[in-house]
């Protein structure tokens, strides 16, 4: 159990003490590298830890959810399922839209995933419907990731169709080309088209069918190659008037002749310029608009991407007419910048508080300047390494540097205090610097490497949480390493040049008063320590009680995953009865918008109705509520959400689900609430049986709120039951029936108009305003084999049934997602346990599997690994300390201080009403590294006193405790004040920082009080144990 003797010649610090110019220039180089690194570092909310995610969207207007599932989604899923590196595949098939989200392993590059997706789409092409208007389109974007920027385009003078056309060609395409942009979507569905609305009675009276009209239009509007003539002297390209560009041209189109007279399209239909899809709409506040949502690619830097968009916007909007107004409704980077700025301010506050506490203890300006230089130098130098590692300035790295403020000053304080002690004894400053630095060098190395050992397990945390805290752990470790280098080089050199007996003895009224105060505190501590050493077993029982209390608090404290942030943006889903039409839903949405916009915290609102890549059915609407900046509103986001939901409850027939947007997005599906739980089965029938039963029980749980499900199986279906025998007798096939129905009610895209800038569609449908509702089916006519016109009603009956509004898959099997929030008086851990207990009471069949998704799944994973993470940190520290001390016993003495940190942190979190989440757990792990510093400083000096002065273990540890009391108190207060700004944080992003500060401040206060007494007692008990063990071995050897 011997340690290396401290050197009196300066050890590794001697070279730097004796060469002040070289040392100064070396530090200047570190400072300049850090400043350059800081200017080069990108800014972001959190480290870039996104899963490589690709979304594949296929539109098939008029197709029902079951047709989309079987004809589009399933063939694509089979191909995608063969890709390597695929982590999860989810899909949503609704009326006319299939959306497949592919999430890949973190280790797979996004570009590689993109190539595999493109190859899979190509392989599935022959399996998809032949009349699919457009092939599947993929985007490198996570649909659950909220847009980084939302813009509204409005006009008081132009129709929305023209506005969307201009925005799509002049603005959206250019923004899509910006590096980092994954997808630009235009919500509002006002893409220009020529709409042909057939008068069913008119065509029936003329003996025509919709298929006759469709064939006439498709044959009259073509755009194909015609060849060229190559003569002896000239070459001539052939062209023709085969394209029709306007609604007026289509009106004049002759579709048939009757009795020698032409029948024009305008005679049997209303032909007009309109929108390609009349069941889509978007609004900005109360005004109809084209809403442009910009989403980033996974892994792209959000700040630089948004900056590029803003720089380009003025140039893009110049090309638009003056009546067209482009407004930025939301920009997520505004809150990200504010959050980072607040964290930087807290970092500056931490540095100021730490320097203040140094002056309070040292009471000497030159002695205060030395650590005052070491702290910012260590932190600034870290930026240079961060650039090399491709890190960013984000909330977590800045939190690491803020916490590091208390860490890095420790080393300088320990060195200065030890050197000052020798100067006060009469040593020359140079000799004192050499002797003091050499004596303390081993302690600094022990402190540094044992603290870094605590951080090592963070690097091995799995999945996205591990990636998230990788930058935190490495940034903190680098700052600690640089601090150790500075403390062993610059600090002793400055002590040798700036400290003297005169400067240390020079006192004013404040220093004399504080000196007396510290002397009284040390004397009182000495008296208390003597009493404690006389009652070792009582003290040991207190230490064991803290261990037991830590375990109990760990079991009972509310547990969460990640703090809910207030980013100033709320995502909402509006739900209406399943049979709601587009017009009905649009009206309800406007009613809800009126209510929301009256709230004093709301700045703007965008809303969308219709089926697209994010909205699965006509009975739901998507909302984005943009709040005023935090300093301009009285309430935080959770209170605003509660107030809005209460207000909207007064609107009949709708349910509103709200959740605040978060910087960390783990989900791959746009959800109604923050947390998800899925049921997966081999068939839809099994889900239809068990989902309602589970929902009924979950909605009764007090641990859950806003419980809802995406299972909607009460969508109205008009089932056309064809008498196949009768149809066959008339020469009518099922394809003829499907075509007739599709022509009438599918907003069928039957032809394409080509222009120099864009392509537009011709849309065919029946004019349902003439014959609304199910009566429109009685107007359908088909052509028999002999050319006669046959009413559909003569060969078919229409039955009203129910069917799902959307069909969801997870890894190719049907799935239902139950979404929920957690009330304020419960934690996510409570909710998860309640769901699991409820599931057990149902006795679900074996063919139904359940699983938490997104943040909830990550919470389970993180919670399961937390205990092992802490154990790994303790084991890593034990190994490092054992190697440094060449002892099996002393590391245990040092680690015995850890339960006190756990008790303090957990108690502080419970008193503050905070959950034990991932951020708080990181704080507890850091406490393990801080608290053991006290024990290291005590034990190092006690061992030295035993070895060099021949003291007894009791006298040695007693003297070590008194000698090191002031630096222990100083370093603990420095670490506490470094964490204090985080605990008291109230600005943007405070929710993320506060748990770390609360846990560390609580842990430091409790551990500081207890370890000053428990550590020396445990040191003596283990010393007696070691002596007893040696005597036993010696006795056995003598007997042998």
From Swiss-Prot:
Annotated GO CC locations: plasma membrane
Q: Which residues form a coiled coil?
A: none
Whether Cell membrane counts among this entry's keywords is yes
Q: Which cell locations does it reside in?
A: Cell inner membrane
Q: What induces it?
A: The mdtABC operon is transcriptionally activated by BaeR.
What gene makes this protein? mdtB
Membrane topology listed for this record? Multi-pass membrane protein
Record's NCBIfam families? PRK10503.1 (NF007798), RND_permease_2 (NF033617)
Q: Which InterPro entries match?
A: AcrB_DN_DC_subdom, Acrflvin-R, Multidrug-R_MdtB
Task: Return the SUPFAM superfamilies for the record.
Answer: Multidrug efflux transporter AcrB pore domain, PN1, PN2, PC1 and PC2 subdomains (SSF82693), Multidrug efflux transporter AcrB TolC docking domain, DN and DC subdomains (SSF82714), Multidrug efflux transporter AcrB transmembrane domain (SSF82866)
Keyword annotations for this protein? Cell inner membrane, Cell membrane, Membrane, Transmembrane, Transmembrane helix, Transport
Name of the protein: Multidrug resistance protein MdtB
Q: Per the similarity annotation, which family is this?
A: Belongs to the resistance-nodulation-cell division (RND) (TC 2.A.6) family. MdtB subfamily.
Q: TM segments?
A: 16-36, 347-367, 369-389, 396-416, 440-460, 472-492, 537-557, 863-883, 888-908, 911-931, 968-988, 998-1018
Purpose of the protein: The MdtABC tripartite complex confers resistance against novobiocin and deoxycholate.
**GO MF annotations in UniProt:** xenobiotic transmembrane transporter activity
Subunit description? Part of a tripartite efflux system composed of MdtA, MdtB and MdtC. MdtB forms a heteromultimer with MdtC.
Q: Which domain of life is it from?
A: Bacteria
Q: Which Pfam families match?
A: ACR_tran
Q: What is the lineage of its organism?
A: Bacteria, Pseudomonadati, Pseudomonadota, Gammaproteobacteria, Enterobacterales
